[in-house]
Amino acid sequence: MLPHGLIVSCQALADEPLHSSFIMSKMALAAYEGGAVGIRANTKEDILAIKETVDLPVIGIVKRDYDHSDVFITATSKEVDELIESQCEVIALDATLQQRPKETLDELVSYIRTHAPNVEIMADIATVEEAKNAARLGFDYIGTTLHGYTSYTQGQLLYQNDFQFLKDVLQSVDAKVIAEGNVITPDMYKRVMDLGVHCSVVGGAITRPKEITKRFVQVMED
């Protein structure tokens, strides 16, 4: 089980300056030394490097684009197999109701339970309906990861209206809820923890220096 506390997302995509499994492992080490209780990471290679560097539970994902589907976070059994090989403690996958490129969400959950019974599963959702569906399927954790990042939730931010969407999710499911997406300040982190989430994932505000720099520069340009 993931501990209560701060999970730091250590990810850099291929077009980003810090794209490197070695660099991500050092980013994870910095997070560990700062008090993080877990890491969220993308790709088998990054996860293996991170697990060699820090003794923390890892939420693993594989981001891969597919034609004719907007689902890209651990979209098929191929990505699941890569994550099982990485020996991450938790596999996270897109649990939205969008059209998937291959297996159904139900089939992927069954696949993970069969092939990796000791691995926990996290649902990345965008709506309360999707949270309820994930709970019905037996996900161990339900994360607000994709709220604001789908075509039908675009422009919505987790912290709007004092985290009302997060409150709605917490009231709708019995599963452990993870706050993720636009938790961008220590005060926001404290607020979501006080609301009763199991843990919170923070990424860009900690591990994306290019984006952090842009925010400082943008203030003067505005």
From Swiss-Prot:
Enzyme class: isomerase
Catalytic activity: an N-acyl-D-glucosamine 6-phosphate = an N-acyl-D-mannosamine 6-phosphate
EC number: 5.1.3.9
Pfam families associated with the record: NanE
Alphabetical keyword list: Carbohydrate metabolism, Isomerase
A GO molecular-function descriptor: N-acylglucosamine-6-phosphate 2-epimerase activity
Single GO cellular component term: cytosol
A Gene Ontology biological process term: N-acetylmannosamine catabolic process
Domain of life per record: Bacteria
InterPro entries, A to Z: Aldolase_TIM, NanE, RibuloseP-bd_barrel
Pathway where it operates: Amino-sugar metabolism; N-acetylneuraminate degradation; D-fructose 6-phosphate from N-acetylneuraminate: step 3/5
Stated family: Belongs to the NanE family.
Protein purpose: Converts N-acetylmannosamine-6-phosphate (ManNAc-6-P) to N-acetylglucosamine-6-phosphate (GlcNAc-6-P).
HAMAP family associated with the record: ManNAc6P_epimer
Name the UniProt record assigns to this protein: Putative N-acetylmannosamine-6-phosphate 2-epimerase
